[in-house]
């Protein structure tokens, strides 16, 4: 039984770069529109970043900085997003299905912070 993560049809370096960009955009804007599988992978990583930010120490900040590509987003994550979820253990995100994409019929969803 395969488990772990989705390959998303890309080599490792491209997949990692794409997911870093998706997580950064998601944390910056609070919601993004993407495909189901990308959203599920992004959700997993974003929730890990929020949990790290809730710790609030320097090591956690550096760990988040090594993944999130913009310092302003890290500042927002630690100062605004993490305190909002201080009482909640996980489940910081929600996925809404929007139907198929017009061009290729891929299932589109909106991933947003709860």
Swiss-Prot record:
Record-linked PROSITE patterns: RIBOSOMAL_L17
Gene Ontology terms for molecular function: structural constituent of ribosome
Listed InterPro entries: Ribosomal_bL17, Ribosomal_bL17_CS, Ribosomal_bL17_sf
GO biological process entries: translation
Keyword terms of this UniProt record: Ribonucleoprotein, Ribosomal protein
Chain segments annotated as coiled-coil in the UniProt record: none
Highest taxon listed in the record's lineage: Bacteria
SUPFAM superfamilies associated with the record: Prokaryotic ribosomal protein L17
Listed Gene3D superfamilies: Ribosomal protein L17 (3.90.1030.10)
Keyword Chaperone appears in the UniProt entry: no
This protein's GO CC annotations: cytosolic large ribosomal subunit
Subunit details: Part of the 50S ribosomal subunit. Contacts protein L32.
Family: Belongs to the bacterial ribosomal protein bL17 family.
Protein name listed in UniProt: Large ribosomal subunit protein bL17
Organism encoding this protein: Clostridium acetobutylicum (strain ATCC 824 / DSM 792 / JCM 1419 / IAM 19013 / LMG 5710 / NBRC 13948 / NRRL B-527 / VKM B-1787 / 2291 / W)
Lineage: Bacteria, Bacillati, Bacillota, Clostridia, Eubacteriales
